[in-house]
Structure formats: structure tokens, C-alpha cells
Regions:
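Active-site nucleophile-adjacent alpha helix/oxyanion-hole segment immediately C-terminal to the catalytic cysteine
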Residues: 1-75, 79, 87, 91, ...
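Noncatalytic regulatory segments and standalone regulatory/sensor domains
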Residues: 145-167
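Short glycine-aromatic motifs
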Residues: 14, 98-100, 127, 154-157
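Conserved active-site-adjacent core of cysteine acyl-enzyme catalytic domains
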Residues: 59-133, 139-148
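Generic detection of intrinsically disordered/low-complexity segments and helix-coil linkers/edges
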Residues: 8-10, 111, 154
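Functionally constrained cores in energy, signaling, and assembly domains
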Residues: 39, 137, 158
Length: 167
């Protein structure tokens, strides 16, 4: 069911809904996990565990030498607490059987790069927007996040992740 809001006075055309799905209401760099939970109504702990697993599997394996000729290989101990890459985020959504696609919004026109902006007219009704250094859930004409990432000036939109059926 779509929620109806009055028209936003913000330059992005989006409203801000302050939401934090973290069980302890902590605020740190888990924006990818928060965005997945808020955009697709999934449980935070399940998403965090799956995203952490994907992040570790996609990370490089480190090789150490102790100086005696022995080599030790170690996998990354990174967690989803400090951000997700585009591949980690998409793989996590696919693990929940969501048929998603990343739509890049930059393109070349007459030899120069053209970048779209984080604006209601450039996004589908439900998606995860990729803005510089951040993922944010967009649903029903509003951003759903722990802080107002719309900004005072127009922000570049790198791309967005949405269901293939929403394209």
C-alpha cells in the first residue's frame, strides 16, 4: 500500500522519514543493510549476517610471511557494519530471492560525462539509491534513513538498485 504525502518543499522532491531498523538503534556505517531492510521489509539481523558473509567472501585473501619461508593465508574479517560495495549489496538481495538490477545513471553525451541528480523524478517508486559514499532506501516518494541524506544542494545519483519488474 503506497503512502500519500503532501508535495515536498525540498529541491529533491523527496520527503524524509527518520527510521532506524538496527535492533539497538545504533547509528554507524551500516547504510547498505539499513537500506535493504527499509526498502524491502526484511529483518535487520538476517540481512546483516548475509551481507557480512558476502562481504567476506568477496574480499581478497591476504598472504603473510613470518620470515622463515612459511606463508599464512587469511580471509578478511570485515563486517557489514562499515558499508557494502555495489556487488555485496546486490548479492545480498539476490540471496533473499529478489530479482534486482543495478541501473547506472551516468552516461556520456557528445564526449562528456553527464550525471543525474538525487531527485524524485530520476528514481522508481521503490529502490535503493546509490549516492556518493551512501546507500539510501527510497519508497513512496520519501527517503527512509537515520539521517537526512537529501542535502542542502543537489546530490549526484550514481545509480540505484530496484526490482527488475519496476524498470
Amino acid at each position: 500500500m503506497a503512502i500519500e504525502f503532501p508535495k515536498s518543499s525540498h529541491q529533491s522532491g523527496l520527503r524524509f522519514m527518520n527510521r532506524n531498523p538496527h535492533p539497538k538503534k545504533e547509528r554507524h556505517g551500516d547504510c547498505g543493510v539499513r537500506a535493504i531492510c527499509l526498502a524491502f521489509d526484511l529483518d535487520y539481523d538476517k540481512v546483516w549476517k548475509r551481507a557480512t558473509s558476502n562481504k567476506r567472501n568477496n574480499a581478497p585473501v591476504y598472504c603473510y610471511s613470518d620470515g622463515t619461508g612459511s606463508h599464512y593465508y587469511e580471509r578478511s574479517k570485515a563486517t557489514a557494519t562499515w558499508g557494502l560495495s555495489k556487488d555485496d549489496l546486490i548479492e545480498t538481495l539476490q540471496d533473499f530471492n529478489l530479482d534486482v538490477v543495478y541501473k547506472k545513471t551516468a552516461y556520456k553525451e557528445q564526449g562528456r560525462n553527464v550525471q543525474m541528480y538525487f531527485n524524485a523524478g530520476n528514481l522508481p517508486d521503490r529502490c535503493i539509491a546509490h549516492i556518493p559514499r551512501h546507500w539510501v532506501a527510497v519508497r513512496d516518494g520519501a527517503i527512509w534513513d537515520t539521517w537526512d541524506s537529501r542535502g542542502k544542494r543537489p546530490r549526484k545519483l550514481r545509480g540505484y538498485v530496484c526490482l527488475r519488474s519496476d524498470l
